[in-house]
Amino acid sequence: DVAPSRGLGDVYKRQDIETPIGGTLLGALQSGGIFLSSACGGGGKCGQCRAQVIDGGGEILPTEKGFFSRKQVKDHWRLACQCKVKEDMVVQVPDEVFGVKEWECEVISNKNVATFIKEFIVALPKGEHMDFIPGSYAQIKIPTYSMDYNKDIDKSLIGPEYLPAWEKFGLFGLKCKNDSPSIRAYSMANYPAEGDRIMLTVRIATPPFKPKPQVGFMDVMPGIASSYIFTLKPGDKVTMSGPYGDFHPIFDSKREMMWIGGGAGMAPLRAQIMHMTKTLKTTDRKMSYFYGARALNEVFYLEDFLEIEKEFPNFTFHLALDRPDPAADAAGVKYTAGFVHQVIHDTYLKDHEAPEDIEYYMCGPGPMSKAVENMLDNLGVPREMLHFDDFGG
């Protein structure tokens, strides 16, 4: 018996699910069309698949306790992927879960937009629609497979601009195998006005390099989700679900907004910025976007932001490139050399009257996020003004 967290009295959303004994609560809920977030695919690592087990379910496991406060444990919160169905159960799930749907989608595009990043676009089935707030993420089912990068990745979809780097680093010598079906979460780069589709920016997760002076990759498998996505071609079918997450803009505030991104962390930030400008036509808030990349050929959606900058005087786009880039100079693209956290500080925040009054929205690689966090902390920005996304970087 499943009900929303706002109370068991809300009968209108109660649902009975019959399931065989022995499986996980996560699997049982999925079989009943209730899709809890599960970024790690049910491995007990992400702590996302939370539900309140009001009756049944037994004692909480040691593997779950680290994800909950003592009060939450007392209130019967569990990780659905760790909780086995051994008897009749009464379960409460977060209200928004009832808005999540799963579809078989068709791939409509899967091209590289940077050396190691794909723009992956799928169409929802005809007549289907997803209501979501920009900054949400989707989940993709990863089936069992065995693949060879050289045979199974379409080189024409990587493109001539990026192929030399793939060959130089030996990526086409990699192989990947997935022995059990899994799920992965990726932030959506699209915003609602772009129609009934899901657009992700996916970075290939290669094995670490061997320590110098050795060359090549360590004998470790590449990422099973990104490897799978990089093999997909237009016309292929994939199972997706969404929307999930709460990395959303605060719409009813008039505070200044700053987005900070790097790498594939572009996705949810693009969605939010496009929605705030193109859809909501926001002109009464100061807005800026600082994006960090190694070089100009690793920057994508640049035209989107330059166009918004022209159309909205309250929006500015700032590009930070790791080092001086002759290609950017030749193209006349404005940028500042340096890491993004330093560029934000030196070119903007150090002379800002009140950095603590800005809302910060951040998504990108771990080291970037940590450096930005430390810089903002040193400026006295309270933690609650920072909004993070975990599924884009």
Task: Give the location of each predicted region.
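Single conserved hydrophobic/aromatic residue that forms the stacking wall/gate
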Residues: 1-12
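FNR/FR-type flavoprotein reductase catalytic core
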Residues: 206-393
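Generic structural signal for buried aliphatic residues
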Residues: 25, 138, 238-240
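Fe-S ferredoxin-like electron-transfer domains
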Residues: 66-128
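Short, contiguous acidic and Ser/Thr-rich linear segments
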Residues: 14-23
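Ferredoxin-reductase
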Residues: 106-234, 293-294, 320-324
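Local cysteine-cluster metal-coordination motifs and their immediate loop/turn environment
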Residues: 35-62, 70-87, 362, 366-367
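Short, surface-exposed secondary-structure boundary micro-motifs
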Residues: 51-57, 94-96, 143, 203, ...
